[in-house]
A protein has these predicted regions:
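N-terminal alpha/beta PP-like core and its mobile active-site loop of ThDP/TPP-dependent enzymes
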Residues: 1-186
Length: 186
């Protein structure tokens, strides 16, 4: 259906696919992957009910500041908001629970938009991004020279600030020497 070209592209490029039985499981798996590895998780779901089923996992990642990308299918741009099969306002639904939610409007921008969505998952406070890719955008072929491909390493998200190692060492020393240590963290 709506995401068949993404599935085939992953297979053609040797990208491992973990197929699950339900879209909610896919979004929770992407969240879990990010929690376990520290790298953004990614799930790809079909349009309509596939995207709505994934909402809970995305909302969970949003509240917990977990970096993940959900890519959802959509009907063709020419049929968008005309009641076509599984045509729902995915971006509108995702905006309140993501850091970034957008539709890819041209095949030329696919790589750029995927890169942008991934970057946003780790920009400032971590959190999920949503990218909707319509069927006709996925079906179109363009020469590589027309594709907007971001330069590797040119753009990067800011990272979370970590405590100064010297301060951590001082705190550990104070706690280890205390008679009755108590730590209150918030």
């Amino acid at each position: 259906g709506h995401i068949f070209d993404i599935y085939n592209g992953c297979l053609n490029e040797g990208i491992k696919i973990i197929d699950v039985r339900h879209e909610e499981v896919a979004s929770h798996a992407a969240d879990g992957y990010a929690r376990m590895t520290g790298k953004p998780g990614c799930a790809v779901v079909t349009a309509g009910p596939g995207t709505t089923h994934a909402l809970t996992g995305v909302a969970n990642a949003f509240r917990a500041e977990i970096p993940m990308l959900l890519i959802g299918g959509q009907s063709s741009l020419t049929q968008h908001k005309m009641g076509s099969l599984q045509d729902l306002p995915h971006v509108d639904m995702m905006q309140p629970i993501t850091k970034f939610a957008a539709t890819v409007m041209s095949t030329e921008r696919c790589a750029d938009m995927v890169s942008m969505a991934f970057r946003e998952t780790r920009n400032g406070s971590f959190g999920p991004s949503f990218l909707e890719i319509p069927r006709d955008i996925l079906d179109s072929s363009i020469p590589m020279s027309k594709a907007v491909v971001p330069e590797t390493g040119k753009y990067s998200a800011s990272s979370k600030t970590l405590a100064d190692p010297v301060d951590v060492e001082k705190a550990a020393d104070i706690i280890s020497k205390a008679e009755r240590p108590c730590v209150l963290l918030g």
